[in-house]
Amino acid sequence: GEWTLFSPDEVPELTETYGSTFENYYTRYEARAKEGKMKIVKHMKARDLWRKMVTMLYETGHPWITFKDPSNIRSPQDHVGVVHNSSLCTEITLNNSEEETAVCNLGSLNFQRLMINGKFDVDAVASTTRTAMRMLDNVIDVNFYPTIEAKRSNFRHRPVGLGLMGFHDALYMMNINFDSDEAVKFADESMELISYHAILASSDFARERGATETFRGSKGERVFSH
């Protein structure tokens, strides 16, 4: 199929929409382009565009690719804005606008330090995750913000990201091959464990400190209220 490329200043709705709404605007602009009512237009086969993108990624390592529809459909903050882009490594997708610059507060658990006598210590993971979440939440309050837009976003949504390091060290200490099914199983189970305790800690902090300004109406509230 053929894709039509537009200049962003002529199609402002495409930046702020996704899914069926985006599709409706896109087809309208395509019709306007066929009528000669758009100033800057380029037609290109989707296969050729994809090949060009993948070739650049292979040759240079950039651009990293993520997809707008899934990012917004799965966004827990879909009620307060649109996800326009991601962080460099595409692990963070937050909504932003002229009034808010998306900011995320990041930390990591070191799996190597969570290994006790060759075993992954789930109790240590639980307590460390809780401590890490509290520290990340505290960072929001004491951090330096270069712009008011960044501060406004951070205080309204209080986003945090908790990842890991030392994964391969843990596999080595458990005598698990990196490319084995057992390694995949450990990755799934360990991250599910971290996710559980991170969400549990977050909900406990909400009782202690109050929910975020934008919790009401979010996916979190919609899930927990049913």
Question: Model-derived features: where do they sit?
Answer:
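Active-site cavity-forming subdomains of large catalytic enzyme subunits
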Residues: 1-111, 115-122, 145-151, 198, ...
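N-proximal short alpha-helices
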Residues: 22, 36, 140, 156, ...
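Short, electropositive, low-hydrophobicity segments enriched in small/polar residues
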Residues: 65, 111, 165, 170, ...
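Ubiquitous "structural anchor" signal
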Residues: 69, 169-171, 183
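Short coil-to-beta-strand
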Residues: 101-107, 131-134, 165
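Contiguous, well-ordered alpha-helical segments that form the cores/surfaces of helical PPI scaffolds
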Residues: 108, 137, 158-173
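Internal maturation/activation junctions in enzymes
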Residues: 128-151, 155, 159, 176-226
